[in-house]
Design a protein with these regions (language model features):
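N-terminal hydrophobic/helix-forming segments and targeting peptides
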Residues: 1-167
Length: 167
C-alpha cells in the first residue's frame, strides 16, 4: 500500500514508521496552518495460536474485536514460520459432548473454541504441518461481485474503501 500511495504523492515528504503508518507532508509546511489527517487502516482482526493440545487441536487467542458467535464453522489460514499457509476450521464443542449446563447456557468464549487442521497429535501439528505457538491465523474470506445487481460481497469493506479513498 505504501508503494502504491507513494506513486501519487510526488512532491510530498513521505515517512513511514515501525507500524507501517504513512505520513505525507507538504514541503515547508507552515506550523500556523491547520493540519488535516486522512485516516484508514488495512489491518484485520485475527488470531494467534496459543497452545497445541495433545490431540492436535489448536487453542487460539483473538487479536482485535471479533464476534464469537460468528466464528464456529469458519475456516482460517494459519501462517507458519516458514511462510506456509495451513487451513483449519474453528469448532465449538459438539452438542453431544456437552453436559446439561453447557447445553442450557449456549454461551461461547474463546476458551471453548478450537481450530482443527486435521492433525491427530501435537507432534503431527508441529512436525508435519509446521505450526508453532504464536503463529498468526486469519479468517479465510472471499470476495465476489454480483454483476446483475451491481453488489460486492466480502468483508472489511470499510477498511479497504477508506484506503482507496485516501489514495
Amino acid at each position: 500500500v505504501i508503494r502504491t500511495v507513494a506513486k501519487y504523492c510526488k512532491g510530498l515528504e513521505l515517512e513511514n514508521d515501525a507500524m507501517n503508518n504513512l505520513y505525507a507532508r507538504m514541503p515547508g509546511e507552515d506550523p500556523e496552518k491547520p493540519v488535516v489527517m486522512l485516516d484508514a487502516h488495512t489491518d484485520e482482526c485475527g488470531f494467534m495460536v496459543q497452545s497445541i493440545r495433545e490431540n492436535g487441536s489448536l487453542e487460539i487467542l483473538m487479536l482485535g474485536g471479533v464476534i464469537l458467535t460468528n466464528l464456529p464453522a469458519h475456516t482460517v489460514m494459519i501462517r507458519t514460520r516458514s511462510g506456509k499457509l495451513v487451513r483449519g476450521i474453528i469448532s465449538s464443542k459438539p452438542i453431544h459432548f456437552m453436559n446439561e449446563a453447557e447445553r442450557a447456557s449456549q454461551s461461547l468464549s474463546i476458551e471453548t473454541l478450537i481450530v482443527d487442521v486435521g492433525a491427530v497429535s501435537r507432534k503431527e501439528v508441529t512436525e508435519v504441518f509446521g505450526i508453532s505457538i504464536g503463529d498468526p491465523a486469519v479468517p479465510e474470506v472471499s470476495f465476489s461481485y454480483d454483476e446483475e445487481r451491481d453488489l460486492c460481497f466480502g468483508k472489511a469493506f470499510d477498511n479497504r474503501a477508506g484506503c482507496a479513498c485516501i489514495i
